[in-house]
Amino acid sequence: MKPWYVLLGTAIVAIGGIFAYCATRAADGPALASSARIDLARYMGAWYVIANIPYFAERGKVATRDVYALDADGNVATTYVYRKSFDDPEKTMGSLGIVQPGSNNAYWIVRFLWLIRADYLILEVAPDYAWALVGQPSRKLGWVHARDPAMDDAQYRDLLGKFAAFGYDTSRFARVPQFREQVGRAGFQ
């Protein structure tokens, strides 16, 4: 009989491989690219997750944000902050974004536990860095980020229109509750 830690390690690698395949496999149509030029120093800091295409790791979370910090090697240390409900304490998950050369800082390979790899593509950022649209070349996942946790409906619709111009099916996006009164409202997770 194999020790339990060998079986656990094998299971983690297998699950990581499945996730990496699902997160990076191409969608129908040409792969998405970005022409954005990102000033990494301005991009660092807290970004609230206003909306996303829900998937297992973020589905059902509330009051979420990503906090980015540039490390000495030029990589981006990321802390995902979330709550399972507004009554629960904050929890965090960490990852490392490796900025890809020649991408104008817009394309990162993100590693979770060094086993799982995902694409991170900054499609567009506001001139004042108040919001950012983030996706993947496959268009499987997407996020609306903002420096402020509150975003009015008109601006949100405008940003979804930008995602549509990038070839996304915007009906797949759902807003993330940042405030207790948003829970259960139409259009929110």
What are the roles of these predicted feature ranges?
Residues 2-189:
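A beta-rich soluble binding module of mature secreted/lumenal proteins
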